[in-house]
């Protein structure tokens, strides 16, 4: 089986971006895990390696499948942090939760404009 091991995430401030995501997801992180990277340990098999850059970089989208309890906890942490969210990939933050595809999902944008998503039921699986 092929598994995704790590992803490099560009940021204006790798430490601040990694710290914020780790706190929202309630996962461990390391400010200087690999020298120039601040690592967010999403799960035992996936690390997001944040790197600081002054160069232009594209806005990326990252989605995490979570349990209902994790969804509720992350939503509460977003609310406590004053970070807005929405139930649709486009549009303004309206505090709504998406319910398409038989689960719940929300999107939020972080300071570098990357678009983060959590969902309780994947809609991206190949049928069969």
Q: Which stretches of residues belong to each language-model region?
A:
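N-terminal beta-strand motif that seeds the catalytic metal site of vicinal oxygen chelate
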Residues: 1-15, 61-62, 66, 122-128
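Short beta-strand micro-motifs in enzyme catalytic cores
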Residues: 36-38, 60, 102-106
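Vicinal oxygen chelate
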Residues: 81-128
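Core segments of cupin and vicinal oxygen chelate
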Residues: 2, 8-48, 54-55
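Short amphipathic alpha-helices in soluble, non-transmembrane regions
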Residues: 22-24, 75-80
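Short, conserved charged micro-motifs
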Residues: 16-18, 69-74
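Short glycine-enriched loop/turn motifs at secondary-structure junctions
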Residues: 1-3, 55-59, 99-100
